[in-house]
Protein backbone atom coordinates (compact mmCIF):
# COMPACT_ATOMS: atom_id res chain seq x y z
CA UNK A 1 0.00 0.00 0.00
CA UNK A 2 1.28 3.46 -0.89
CA UNK A 3 0.56 6.22 1.59
CA UNK A 4 0.61 9.94 0.82
CA UNK A 5 1.15 12.24 3.80
CA UNK A 6 1.14 16.01 4.18
CA UNK A 7 3.58 17.15 6.84
CA UNK A 8 4.80 20.37 8.42
CA UNK A 9 8.08 21.07 10.13
CA UNK A 10 9.99 23.81 11.88
CA UNK A 11 13.27 23.89 9.98
CA UNK A 12 15.25 25.80 12.60
CA UNK A 13 17.03 22.81 14.15
CA UNK A 14 17.30 20.72 10.99
CA UNK A 15 20.16 20.51 8.52
CA UNK A 16 17.64 20.48 5.71
CA UNK A 17 15.26 17.76 4.59
CA UNK A 18 17.50 15.14 2.96
CA UNK A 19 19.42 12.51 4.94
CA UNK A 20 23.03 13.52 5.66
CA UNK A 21 25.48 11.36 7.63
CA UNK A 22 25.85 12.56 11.20
CA UNK A 23 23.36 15.41 10.84
CA UNK A 24 19.79 15.87 12.00
CA UNK A 25 17.41 16.02 9.03
CA UNK A 26 13.67 15.76 8.47
CA UNK A 27 13.93 12.66 6.29
CA UNK A 28 16.08 10.91 8.89
CA UNK A 29 13.52 11.54 11.64
CA UNK A 30 10.66 10.33 9.42
CA UNK A 31 12.44 7.14 8.43
CA UNK A 32 13.45 6.38 12.02
CA UNK A 33 9.84 6.78 13.19
CA UNK A 34 8.59 4.52 10.40
CA UNK A 35 11.19 1.88 11.26
CA UNK A 36 9.94 1.83 14.86
CA UNK A 37 6.33 1.61 13.73
CA UNK A 38 7.14 -1.27 11.36
CA UNK A 39 9.36 -2.96 13.98
CA UNK A 40 12.04 -3.05 11.32
CA UNK A 41 15.82 -2.88 11.59
CA UNK A 42 15.89 -1.39 8.11
CA UNK A 43 14.80 2.07 7.07
CA UNK A 44 11.44 2.56 5.38
CA UNK A 45 12.32 4.79 2.39
CA UNK A 46 10.43 8.08 2.29
CA UNK A 47 10.09 10.15 -0.90
CA UNK A 48 9.31 13.87 -0.69
CA UNK A 49 8.02 16.45 -3.17
CA UNK A 50 11.43 18.11 -2.93
CA UNK A 51 14.28 18.96 -0.60
CA UNK A 52 14.40 22.00 1.64
CA UNK A 53 17.63 23.58 2.87
CA UNK A 54 18.89 24.07 6.39
CA UNK A 55 16.60 26.39 8.36
CA UNK A 56 13.80 26.33 5.77
CA UNK A 57 10.32 25.47 7.05
CA UNK A 58 7.38 23.59 5.58
CA UNK A 59 3.67 24.08 6.13
CA UNK A 60 2.61 21.61 3.45
CA UNK A 61 5.40 19.25 2.41
CA UNK A 62 4.15 16.01 0.79
CA UNK A 63 5.79 12.61 1.18
CA UNK A 64 4.99 9.06 0.15
CA UNK A 65 6.13 5.63 1.31
CA UNK A 66 5.06 2.02 0.85
CA UNK A 67 3.86 -0.04 3.78
CA UNK A 68 2.49 -3.54 4.44
CA UNK A 69 0.68 -2.33 7.57
CA UNK A 70 -3.12 -2.28 7.51
CA UNK A 71 -3.53 0.85 9.62
CA UNK A 72 -6.52 2.96 8.43
CA UNK A 73 -5.38 6.12 6.66
CA UNK A 74 -7.00 8.41 9.22
CA UNK A 75 -4.99 6.75 12.02
CA UNK A 76 -1.57 7.24 10.44
CA UNK A 77 -1.10 10.86 11.64
CA UNK A 78 -1.72 9.75 15.23
CA UNK A 79 0.63 6.77 14.93
CA UNK A 80 3.48 8.78 13.42
CA UNK A 81 3.07 11.92 15.51
CA UNK A 82 3.43 9.79 18.65
CA UNK A 83 6.92 8.81 17.44
CA UNK A 84 8.11 12.01 15.76
CA UNK A 85 9.87 14.92 17.50
CA UNK A 86 7.85 18.03 18.30
CA UNK A 87 9.20 19.97 15.31
CA UNK A 88 7.65 17.60 12.74
CA UNK A 89 3.92 16.86 12.43
CA UNK A 90 1.90 14.70 10.06
CA UNK A 91 -1.20 16.73 9.18
CA UNK A 92 -2.99 14.35 6.83
CA UNK A 93 -2.63 10.85 5.37
CA UNK A 94 -4.41 9.11 2.52
CA UNK A 95 -4.02 5.95 0.48
CA UNK A 96 -2.56 6.76 -2.94
CA UNK A 97 -2.44 4.92 -6.24
CA UNK A 98 0.64 2.77 -6.74
CA UNK A 99 1.74 5.14 -9.50
CA UNK A 100 1.62 8.23 -7.28
CA UNK A 101 4.97 9.92 -6.70
CA UNK A 102 5.34 12.80 -4.24
CA UNK A 103 7.86 14.55 -6.49
CA UNK A 104 7.07 13.55 -10.06
CA UNK A 105 3.27 13.67 -9.75
CA UNK A 106 3.34 17.27 -8.49
CA UNK A 107 2.05 19.86 -10.97
CA UNK A 108 2.66 23.03 -8.95
CA UNK A 109 4.39 24.17 -5.77
CA UNK A 110 3.76 27.18 -3.59
CA UNK A 111 6.34 28.90 -1.41
CA UNK A 112 6.00 31.89 0.87
CA UNK A 113 8.72 34.17 2.14
CA UNK A 114 8.20 36.26 5.27
CA UNK A 115 9.94 39.55 6.02
CA UNK A 116 9.40 41.66 9.13
CA UNK A 117 10.33 45.30 8.88
CA UNK A 118 10.28 46.44 12.50
CA UNK A 119 13.02 48.87 13.53
CA UNK A 120 14.71 46.46 15.91
CA UNK A 121 15.18 42.68 15.74
CA UNK A 122 12.56 40.54 17.47
CA UNK A 123 14.18 37.60 19.24
CA UNK A 124 10.98 35.56 18.91
CA UNK A 125 10.90 35.95 15.13
CA UNK A 126 14.58 35.50 14.38
CA UNK A 127 14.21 31.91 13.16
CA UNK A 128 10.93 32.38 11.30
CA UNK A 129 11.12 35.61 9.28
CA UNK A 130 13.85 37.77 7.74
CA UNK A 131 14.49 41.01 9.61
CA UNK A 132 14.82 43.77 7.00
CA UNK A 133 14.43 47.20 8.56
CA UNK A 134 15.00 49.33 5.45
CA UNK A 135 12.12 51.36 4.04
CA UNK A 136 10.61 49.39 1.15
CA UNK A 137 8.74 50.56 -1.93
CA UNK A 138 6.28 47.69 -2.29
CA UNK A 139 4.96 48.94 -5.63
CA UNK A 140 8.45 48.74 -7.13
CA UNK A 141 8.79 45.20 -5.77
CA UNK A 142 5.52 44.22 -7.43
CA UNK A 143 6.56 45.81 -10.73
CA UNK A 144 9.88 43.97 -10.62
CA UNK A 145 8.09 40.69 -9.88
CA UNK A 146 6.01 40.95 -13.06
CA UNK A 147 9.13 40.33 -15.17
CA UNK A 148 9.58 36.92 -13.53
CA UNK A 149 6.07 35.60 -14.16
CA UNK A 150 5.87 33.20 -17.09
CA UNK A 151 8.26 30.65 -18.58
CA UNK A 152 11.92 31.70 -18.49
CA UNK A 153 15.45 30.40 -18.18
CA UNK A 154 16.21 31.08 -14.51
CA UNK A 155 19.99 30.55 -14.67
CA UNK A 156 20.53 33.97 -13.07
CA UNK A 157 18.20 33.05 -10.22
CA UNK A 158 19.69 29.77 -9.02
CA UNK A 159 22.87 28.87 -7.16
CA UNK A 160 25.93 28.84 -9.42
CA UNK A 161 26.77 25.29 -8.31
CA UNK A 162 23.41 23.94 -9.54
CA UNK A 163 24.07 20.86 -11.67
CA UNK A 164 20.65 20.77 -13.34
CA UNK A 165 21.10 21.42 -17.06
CA UNK A 166 17.57 22.56 -17.91
CA UNK A 167 16.95 25.75 -15.98
CA UNK A 168 13.68 26.69 -17.68
CA UNK A 169 10.82 26.98 -15.20
CA UNK A 170 7.34 28.52 -15.19
CA UNK A 171 6.21 30.99 -12.54
CA UNK A 172 2.41 31.20 -12.36
CA UNK A 173 1.97 33.73 -9.56
CA UNK A 174 4.33 36.08 -7.74
CA UNK A 175 3.26 38.92 -5.48
CA UNK A 176 3.96 40.71 -2.22
CA UNK A 177 1.30 41.46 0.36
CA UNK A 178 1.62 43.60 3.46
CA UNK A 179 1.26 41.92 6.85
CA UNK A 180 0.91 43.28 10.38
CA UNK A 181 4.68 43.37 10.87
CA UNK A 182 6.08 43.47 7.35
CA UNK A 183 5.64 41.67 4.03
CA UNK A 184 4.90 38.25 2.63
CA UNK A 185 5.95 37.00 -0.80
CA UNK A 186 3.80 34.30 -2.36
CA UNK A 187 5.12 32.41 -5.38
CA UNK A 188 3.73 29.42 -7.29
CA UNK A 189 5.45 27.61 -10.10
CA UNK A 190 5.97 24.38 -11.99
CA UNK A 191 9.13 23.75 -10.00
CA UNK A 192 12.08 25.60 -8.53
CA UNK A 193 15.85 25.44 -8.88
CA UNK A 194 18.30 25.38 -5.99
CA UNK A 195 18.01 28.66 -4.02
CA UNK A 196 15.70 30.07 -6.72
CA UNK A 197 12.96 31.35 -4.39
CA UNK A 198 15.49 32.88 -1.99
CA UNK A 199 17.34 34.66 -4.80
CA UNK A 200 14.05 35.98 -6.20
CA UNK A 201 13.09 37.26 -2.74
CA UNK A 202 16.48 38.91 -2.25
CA UNK A 203 16.43 40.51 -5.69
CA UNK A 204 12.94 41.92 -5.19
CA UNK A 205 13.99 43.33 -1.83
CA UNK A 206 16.83 45.06 -3.68
CA UNK A 207 14.19 46.61 -5.94
CA UNK A 208 12.26 47.67 -2.85
CA UNK A 209 15.17 49.70 -1.46
CA UNK A 210 16.03 51.23 -4.83
CA UNK A 211 19.27 49.31 -5.30
CA UNK A 212 17.95 48.20 -8.70
CA UNK A 213 15.08 49.44 -10.85
CA UNK A 214 12.12 47.13 -11.53
CA UNK A 215 13.02 46.92 -15.22
CA UNK A 216 16.53 45.67 -14.43
CA UNK A 217 15.03 42.31 -13.48
CA UNK A 218 14.32 41.66 -17.16
CA UNK A 219 17.99 42.15 -18.07
CA UNK A 220 18.98 39.91 -15.15
CA UNK A 221 16.95 37.08 -16.66
CA UNK A 222 18.47 37.66 -20.08
CA UNK A 223 22.03 37.62 -18.67
CA UNK A 224 21.76 33.96 -17.58
CA UNK A 225 24.45 34.63 -15.01
CA UNK A 226 24.06 34.24 -11.24
CA UNK A 227 26.20 37.33 -10.62
CA UNK A 228 23.66 39.46 -12.51
CA UNK A 229 20.87 38.91 -9.96
CA UNK A 230 20.55 40.11 -6.39
CA UNK A 231 21.21 38.75 -2.93
CA UNK A 232 20.16 35.33 -1.66
CA UNK A 233 17.68 35.95 1.15
CA UNK A 234 18.31 33.79 4.25
CA UNK A 235 16.60 30.42 4.55
CA UNK A 236 14.75 31.03 7.80
CA UNK A 237 12.16 33.28 6.12
CA UNK A 238 11.18 30.61 3.58
CA UNK A 239 8.28 28.15 3.84
CA UNK A 240 7.22 25.37 1.47
CA UNK A 241 3.54 26.18 1.72
CA UNK A 242 1.69 23.75 -0.54
CA UNK A 243 2.21 21.10 -3.21
CA UNK A 244 -0.49 20.62 -5.83
CA UNK A 245 -1.50 17.46 -7.69
CA UNK A 246 -4.03 16.77 -10.43
CA UNK A 247 -6.15 14.52 -8.24
Swiss-Prot record:
Q: Which GO terms describe its molecular function?
A: pseudouridine synthase activity; RNA binding; tRNA pseudouridine(38-40) synthase activity
What is the reaction catalyzed?
A: uridine(38/39/40) in tRNA = pseudouridine(38/39/40) in tRNA
Task: Set out the biological process GO terms recorded for this chain's protein.
Answer: tRNA pseudouridine synthesis
The answer on whether this UniProt entry bears the keyword Isomerase reads: yes
Q: Quote the EC number.
A: 5.4.99.12
What InterPro entries has UniProt attached to this entry? PsdUridine_synth_cat_dom_sf, PsdUridine_synth_TruA, PsdUridine_synth_TruA_a/b_dom, PsdUridine_synth_TruA_C, TruA/RsuA/RluB/E/F_N
**Isomerase in keyword set:** yes
Q: Which UniProt keywords apply?
A: Isomerase, tRNA processing
What Pfam families has UniProt attached to this entry? Answer: PseudoU_synth_1 (PF01416)
Highest taxon above the source species: Bacteria
Report residues binding substrate.
Answer: 111
- The catalytic residues are 53 (nucleophile)
> Function of this protein?
Formation of pseudouridine at positions 38, 39 and 40 in the anticodon stem and loop of transfer RNAs.
Tell me how this protein assembles.
Homodimer.
NCBIfam families attached here?
A: hisT_truA (TIGR00071)
Question: What family name appears in the similarity comment?
Answer: Belongs to the tRNA pseudouridine synthase TruA family.
Instruction: Kindly provide the name given to this protein in its UniProt entry.
Output: tRNA pseudouridine synthase A
What organism is the protein native to? Bacillus subtilis (strain 168)
Upper classification of the organism: Bacteria, Bacillati, Bacillota, Bacilli, Bacillales
Amino acid sequence: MRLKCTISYDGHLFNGYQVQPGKRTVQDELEKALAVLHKSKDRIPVVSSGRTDSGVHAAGQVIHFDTPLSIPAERWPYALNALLPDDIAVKQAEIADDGFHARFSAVKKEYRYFVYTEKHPDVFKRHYAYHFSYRLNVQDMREAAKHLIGTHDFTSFCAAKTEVQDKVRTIYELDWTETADGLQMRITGSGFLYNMVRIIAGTLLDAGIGKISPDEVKSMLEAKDREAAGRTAPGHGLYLWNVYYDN
